């Protein structure tokens, strides 16, 4: 789905808005409906719709790259494209499926201490846009030794607020539409949703593909490095996007390395001449770049470049 198609799909839901639900996910791994007064619920819907228009529909600079190609670009919603999903994604799907007549409400006597996240379901055009926001420590205002909440009464006196307040702003960390998930706040994915487990699982897929390719004589060095999350990310990325791994035969790769003016001095080949020796951190680094096809040579100047951003001109 292109960015424009995503905008159009969301616009149809917003333009044909038919209702909103707010669902809490709890530390007990449960979903609980909120009971919010009608006018307040309308204000919540209006706030989130305005935010969606600002972030997505009216954002001319918006892009929607794949999450496995994550970088620090602004105005981006990263489409989740890994095989393994965080548990929170399943909760979003389950929240969408809650029957309209469900009475399974959140108990406010728990004072929001057991709330883990908030799912906002915006319905329209017989479809649902599901926003997810992680509950932060600042989301609940409560009296404590370090914090005292005061509110004015009708006579102008400040009185202690006896109850907790749930503060709900209109930011969100990710959303789902149809079967697709888009990430807005990558930090929440990293710190709250055990995303490292997803990365590690994808890295295992890359290692299995490399093992099956018979391209490397001893893969144990890569396996050891894969325990570091930074390197696991690189393996995960080539498992998804390598134009080399699984597409170019081993002999062609070996011949390319042996004849390459730069790589031939960095990547060693075994005595039989049919496998690469990838043992050092340096060789691992350049092997990953080889699998990403980052080494490019100008036909005009014959200069060899290392290019991470490759915008194809033949598509």
Curated annotation (Swiss-Prot):
Disruption phenotype: Cannot be deleted in a Kiwa-containing strain of E.coli. InterPro entries: KwaB, KwaB-like. This is Kiwa protein KwaB. Keywords: Antiviral defense. The keyword Cell membrane does not apply. Component of antiviral defense system Kiwa, composed of KwaA and KwaB. Expression of Kiwa in E.coli (strain MG1655) confers resistance to phages lambda and SECphi18. Signal peptide: none annotated. One of its GO terms (biological process) is defense response to virus. The lineage of its organism: Bacteria, Pseudomonadati, Pseudomonadota, Gammaproteobacteria, Enterobacterales.
